[in-house]
């Protein structure tokens, strides 16, 4: 397992907080109880967001017929939606720090639904860029990141399996949404299909409502300190998880903020002899002051995570992981966007209608996430090794796909793509091992942002290459080569770890 979260520079206050954290009792909902509701909530979020996006190849064909634009331009609609969902990750981290996961996810569900509904009235591809690409993509990002982060907070053991089970929603969603969108487009047209999908997306608000923050526990034998029971934000062992307003004054002890809250508390107590309307006014002011404290604290935590003394970018292994994410995701997204048209070019539409190739990817994707997650949790198996093997299998499949021209051979390659891409369930686990639980929200936001850039540029690039060559072969070859570059960055990480271990041994030998 990684120990590289030690590479991040913490100050002395963080070290003291880490010592205090050891005295905490295990939270009853960690690894059990409501934790499994987090898995269920995240599962449905993946169905509604990632599943719908992986089924956009159906709508891509409809948009080509409706607007008569080039494949490269039309592919930007799907790419914008997928890309923005992931690119906004670091900024959604600010919302999570300030408002909590529950509120962020609920707002995201509303914005995503609005984007789908407005897209039903689009007059051209450029309109879809705004309504579907930007609006629906932003809403998806606001609901997606909290779903991943909350599972990470609620699980300490079996994290890989929990993330694997929750992210299988992508596979189920791809299968279900592909069938659903095909049926809706055939029966009602693509515009009404998007309107109906917008209504379904409101269920993201229900999923967000289930993201209950970890409740504070009464602690015994808490060491005396200037800051009683001070705990780091965003730890699964922290008493603060979703950022309730009532905890704001306890967790921000800066002199100015403390004075503001204390003064208002004193005024409220003195106001008991005042008319009721004065008491209500003091309570409103107190709530506003607590909200101000919370926003300041959330922004400070978010800013320090990226640019402060605890910057994630001081972790060399994490930086190498970011470079991998920049190249990898497009190789997974491109088949979903362009496979329906590839099948049409090969005159395999009849067989594909019986059992779509994207559904094969989706089904094997489900098994891949669960199996790879379970294997990675075995004590004798390294998560890193499982992650690397799956990556090599996926890039090999991408290289082989253009060579297949029959339905059976394409089905085999799609099965390999689906199963090996199950490593996505390991990404939060690997990220958490690299930076620690406290920095998971910010760190995973950066990783999915890098994935988003890859998803944003990949499909339009493949469509542009097709417009020039009238073949998708070169698109897959080039994306496969870029993926190999990303894997080379992954291989840098073990080398860095070996160098660090040798340095430690040399230092220890010198002291002896």
Swiss-Prot record:
Record-annotated membrane-spanning stretches: 30-50, 76-96, 105-125, 129-149, 161-181, 193-211, 317-337, 355-375, 381-401, 410-430, 446-466, 476-496
MF annotations from Gene Ontology: symporter activity
One Pfam family matching this protein: MFS_1
Keywords of this entry: Cell membrane, Membrane, Symport, Transmembrane, Transmembrane helix, Transport
Cytoplasmic membrane side: 1-29, 497-512
Keyword Transmembrane helix included in the entry's annotation: yes
PANTHER family recorded: MONOCARBOXYLATE TRANSPORTER, MONOCARBOXYLATE TRANSPORTER 14
Function, in words: Proton-linked monocarboxylate transporter. May catalyze the transport of monocarboxylates across the plasma membrane.
Protein's name according to its UniProt entry: Monocarboxylate transporter 14
Organism whose genome encodes this protein: Mus musculus
């Amino acid at each position: 397992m990684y120990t590289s979260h030690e590479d991040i520079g913490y100050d002395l206050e963080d070290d003291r907080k880490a010592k205090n954290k050891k005295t905490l009792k295990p939270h009853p909902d960690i690894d059990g109880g409501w934790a499994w509701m987090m898995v269920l909530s995240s599962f449905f979020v993946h169905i509604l967001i990632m599943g719908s996006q992986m089924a956009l190849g159906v709508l891509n064909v409809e948009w080509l017929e409706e607007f008569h634009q080039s494949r490269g331009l039309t592919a930007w609609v799907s790419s914008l939606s997928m890309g923005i969902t992931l690119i906004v990750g670091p900024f959604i981290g600010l919302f999570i720090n300030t408002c909590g996961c529950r509120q962020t996810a609920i707002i995201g569900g509303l914005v995503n639904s609005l984007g789908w509904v407005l897209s039903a009235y689009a007059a051209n591809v450029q309109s879809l860029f705004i309504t579907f690409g930007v609006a629906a993509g932003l809403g998806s990002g606001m609901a997606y990141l909290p779903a991943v982060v909350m599972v990470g907070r609620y699980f300490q053991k079996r994290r890989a399996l929990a993330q694997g089970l929750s992210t299988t929603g992508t596979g189920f969603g791809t299968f279900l949404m592909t069938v659903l969108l095909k049926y809706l487009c055939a029966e009602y047209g693509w515009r009404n299909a998007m309107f109906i999908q917008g209504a379904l997306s409101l269920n993201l608000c229900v999923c967000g409502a289930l993201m209950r923050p970890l409740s504070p526990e009464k602690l015994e034998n808490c060491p005396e300190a200037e800051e009683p029971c001070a705990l780091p934000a965003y730890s699964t062992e922290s008493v603060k998880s979703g950022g309730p307003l009532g905890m704001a004054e306890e967790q921000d002890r800066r002199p100015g903020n403390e004075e503001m809250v204390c003064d208002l508390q004193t005024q409220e107590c003195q106001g008991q002899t005042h008319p009721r309307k004065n008491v209500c006014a003091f309570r409103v002011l107190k709530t506003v002051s607590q909200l101000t404290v919370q926003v300041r604290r959330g922004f400070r935590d978010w800013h320090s995570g990226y640019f402060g003394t605890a910057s994630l970018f001081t972790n060399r292994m994490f930086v190498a992981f970011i470079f991998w994410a920049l190249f990898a995701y497009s190789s997974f997204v491109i088949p979903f966007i362009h496979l329906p048209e590839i099948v049409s070019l090969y005159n395999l539409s009849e067989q594909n209608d019986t059992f779509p190739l994207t559904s094969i990817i989706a089904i094997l994707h489900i098994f891949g996430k669960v199996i790879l997650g379970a294997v990675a949790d075995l004590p004798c198996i390294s998560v890193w090794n499982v992650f690397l093997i799956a990556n090599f299998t996926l890039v090999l499949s991408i290289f082989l796909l253009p060579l297949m021209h029959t339905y059976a051979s394409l089905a085999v390659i799609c099965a390999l793509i689906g199963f090996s891409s199950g490593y996505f369930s390991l990404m939060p686990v690997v990220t958490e091992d690299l930076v620690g639980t406290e920095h998971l929200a910010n760190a995973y936001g950066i990783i999915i942002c890098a994935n988003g850039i890859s998803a944003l540029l990949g499909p339009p690039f493949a469509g542009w290459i097709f417009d020039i060559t009238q073949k998708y072969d070169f698109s897959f070859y080039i994306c496969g080569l870029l993926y190999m570059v990303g894997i080379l960055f992954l291989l840098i990480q073990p080398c860095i770890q070996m160098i660090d271990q040798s340095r430690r041994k040399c230092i220890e030998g010198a002291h002896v």
